Amino acid sequence: MGRASRSAVLRRALLLLLLLLLLRTTTTRALGPRISVPLGSEERLIRKFEAENISNYTALLLSQDGKTLYVGAREALFALNSNLSFLPGGEYQELLWSADADRKQQCSFKGKDPKRDCQNYIKILLPLNSSHLLTCGTAAFSPLCAYIHIASFTLAQDEAGNVILEDGKGRCPFDPNFKSTALVVDGELYTGTVSSFQGNDPAISRSQSSRPTKTESSLNWLQDPAFVASAYVPESLGSPIGDDDKIYFFFSETGQEFEFFENTIVSRVARVCKGDEGGERVLQQRWTSFLKAQLLCSRPDDGFPFNVLQDVFTLNPNPQDWRKTLFYGVFTSQWHRGTTEGSAICVFTMNDVQKAFDGLYKKVNRETQQWYTETHQVPTPRPGACITNSARERKINSSLQLPDRVLNFLKDHFLMDGQVRSRLLLLQPRARYQRVAVHRVPGLHSTYDVLFLGTGDGRLHKAVTLSSRVHIIEELQIFPQGQPVQNLLLDSHGGLLYASSHSGVVQVPVANCSLYPTCGDCLLARDPYCAWTGSACRLASLYQPDLASRPWTQDIEGASVKELCKNSSYKARFLVPGKPCKQVQIQPNTVNTLACPLLSNLATRLWVHNGAPVNASASCRVLPTGDLLLVGSQQGLGVFQCWSIEEGFQQLVASYCPEVMEEGVMDQKNQRDGTPVIINTSRVSAPAGGRASWGADKSYWNEFLVMCTLFVFAMVLLFLFFLYRHRDGMKLFLKQGECASVHPKTRPIVLPPETRPLNGVGPPSTPLDHRGYQALSDSSPGPRVFTESEKRPLSIQDSFVEVSPVCPRPRVRLGSEIRDSVV
């Protein structure tokens, strides 16, 4: 293959790469929200609480009556009134709890950052009973736990007046950056965290109890886990087999059963029985019911896995019917690092979870660390199961009475072979979700699950699950950019959502139906909280069929606006009541813009001039932003209307009647009528009616940047390929240039002494050539034969050697001859 053919192949390959990259950039689309509300907008009521010199608001707890919100931050706790504390100047209770000086000093000595790490970060804030709260903090890498008296909101003290403090090891993480989970069940604390300073001793434990229990560290039941959530499911209610209540833990860990070139992260669900007391001889004070299974969340088309679990919300609408419990999980993928990291929302049913735990086991070979499916007979009672009626029939009423063979089997069979499969609800390529809260909302005709999703850049997405997809209702910027949503807490009875971040806590109403002024907007929002009354959009929960003058309208699944909004009168949101259009006064030969702000991101604009669609001309043009660019002239005036089109429904957004007025007339009219609406952006240098390029219907700026980047990349590749193909010639060229650049040096003249050779033969009659060594070459007359006496210098001074610092072969003078030496 010649050089020309190779260059042609390279060009074709580069063109193919360019085409693939362009196709990739144009086909990747994200599922976006219908409405976007920026930070500080008046369209959405968002109240924020922040205390001076306090940061890292991580722990949230709502009282049973919903009137008090307890907040845990860095070295401080707060009791907020849900109605007053979020108002400017509202009152609240504050409890300072900082790590003492000794702990901070020891933390600093151990190599931790004194300002960042050696503080007390509140990680646990839970109700212990009707009078006290349980709280735990990192306490400068030496975790502590304390009790808060609810009535006075102070730390509980003993009879001597000292604050009651307990060691938080095994209950609270040492590092504030470590993820952990905790919950209280019947006064007992169940936690999933690390119990060592180095963070290499993870454990699922039970404390605050007369029967402390934990996982066995020596058996490697947990592999570097990151706990995200835990849940209590009362499975004993209505159980025909007499089952026990269970506590579920959700986390991500290293999957030892997979053999890849890198550590594979796996999402897990683990469970323990509430009545587990450990074994009598084997697994003493260790869980005898610990089992774990893999949570599988992947794309249905190609099976791409989302294997990193970020958060789980347990939805149990009816505690009496725990079988309908749903687990909503937020997942990301470890293979999205370095690019825009996407997220996936998957839902797991209680039936799928139980099916995995009732299936086959995996067994690990301790010598080879190989995992395989256990196909041999399983001992009875079933290892890892709670004490049921079948066990009680065998006189086994407690885990302390379990046979040793059952517990020994559990040591190596704690991982289930089956996976907990899910249903993918939402795939979001352009947002990283971190927290989730779910509210089951009763609509006018059905019940819907509304998801509140917190992102890593301070946004909140509100979405509703439909029969075939998930519709993102709105997007709220609740925190500044760069501040992730650290926690979400839903007050379903009060209709409020609380979110926390590094800078504070915000209170967001779950719905704002007044944001939708027309019947079309109200129905197209697909918000289960809202319904159209015939004249306004109101909360659907306020609907009383007996008192309403007409039935309210709501269509979450279909949003059939054309049929349901026929009899509803609507008006443009920017029209003055009683006038067909908005009067706009412009000056001659000026460039003016007519705004058309759409409420929905999913709608498109249609500009109409005197009943006909606007076409690009010298006098008007639609900008990429959707606004209309208008040149002030007497030609082409009339009525300009902007229509919003969404899912086939068209409604008027704005209507303008521009009027060109001379400056003198305009000044007189201003003095007489007040201040009219004048839209003037800039003057044009072209004459009135002349053609000028004011913009384009579509902007290709992003495509232009992509093409420029790819062109530069292709040129760099071609240049590197050229250098590679001619590397030998370049080396020779550089070598010759370096040798030629060396300046000749003046060689000292050495006069040999006038002595005769020992053999008595006189010197040759041919005159000696005294040219310098750089003037000699190998093309000179052939070498002459020297005698042994001539080869040997007459004296040490007769020999002269000089080596060039660049050229590798030195020149050597032997007697009267100068030659290249071979080194």
Swiss-Prot record:
Q: Which residues form the Sema domain?
A: 34-510
Q: Which residues lie on this side of the membrane: Cytoplasmic?
A: 725-823
* Keyword list, A-Z: Developmental protein, Differentiation, Disulfide bond, Glycoprotein, Immunoglobulin domain, Membrane, Neurogenesis, Phosphoprotein, Signal, Transmembrane, Transmembrane helix
Give the way it sits in the membrane.
Single-pass type I membrane protein
Show the GO cellular component annotation of the record: glutamatergic synapse; membrane; plasma membrane; postsynaptic density membrane; synapse
The record's subcellular locations are:
Membrane
Disulfide-bond pairs as recorded: C107-C118, C136-C145, C273-C386, C297-C346, C513-C530, C596-C642
Q: Which residues carry this modification: Phosphoserine?
A: S779, S780, S804, S816
The record places domain Ig-like C2-type at 589-649
Which molecular function GO terms apply here?
Answer: semaphorin receptor binding
**Similarity field:** Belongs to the semaphorin family.
On assembly, the entry states: Interacts with GIPC PDZ domain.
Q: What is this protein called?
A: Semaphorin-4B
Give the species: Mus musculus (Mouse)
User: What's the encoding gene here?
Assistant: Sema4b
